[in-house]
């Protein structure tokens, strides 16, 4: 699948996904300044299938009904906190289907 990382998603996570997915960062596309709705629009238009984000409020800020892109929300943005939960993150990305939403709980500290 074609996976997009938003600005808060640690790039180190990509190495755990690249064997099955193509991963691109929003900043690599020049999308680092886009707000959530516009980022979702651009990502869908470009053919991205999954957005990995650290924005836990995304589902409350955007109407996700009818979206083709799947969204995986990480509970934290710091790699040191995500790393012990990388298996769950990879599983959530692998299980993503068009329009799906998943949140991977990552406790702080």
Residue ranges and their predicted role:
Residues 27, 54, 74-76:
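Short beta->alpha connector loops at strand-helix junctions that form conserved
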Residues 64-68:
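Glycine-rich loop at the start of a catalytic domain that most often binds anionic cofactors/ligands
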Residues 28-31, 57, 61, 71, ...:
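Generic secondary-structure boundary/loop-capping signal
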Residues 43-63:
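Acidic, metal-binding active-site segment of PIN/NYN-like and related structure-specific nucleases
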Residues 69-109:
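C-terminal structural segments of small proteins and small subunits
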């Amino acid at each position: 699948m074609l996976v997009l990382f938003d600005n808060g998603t640690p790039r180190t996570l990509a190495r755990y996904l690249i064997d099955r997915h193509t991963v691109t960062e929003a900043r690599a596309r020049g999308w680092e300044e886009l707000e959530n709705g516009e980022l979702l629009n651009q990502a869908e238009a470009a053919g991205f299938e999954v957005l990995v984000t650290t924005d836990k409020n995304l589902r409350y800020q955007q109407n996700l009904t009818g979206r083709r892109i799947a969204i995986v929300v990480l509970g934290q943005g710091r790699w040191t906190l995500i790393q012990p939960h990388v298996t769950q993150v990879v599983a959530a990305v692998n299980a993503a289907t068009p329009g799906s939403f998943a949140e991977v709980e990552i406790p702080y500290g």
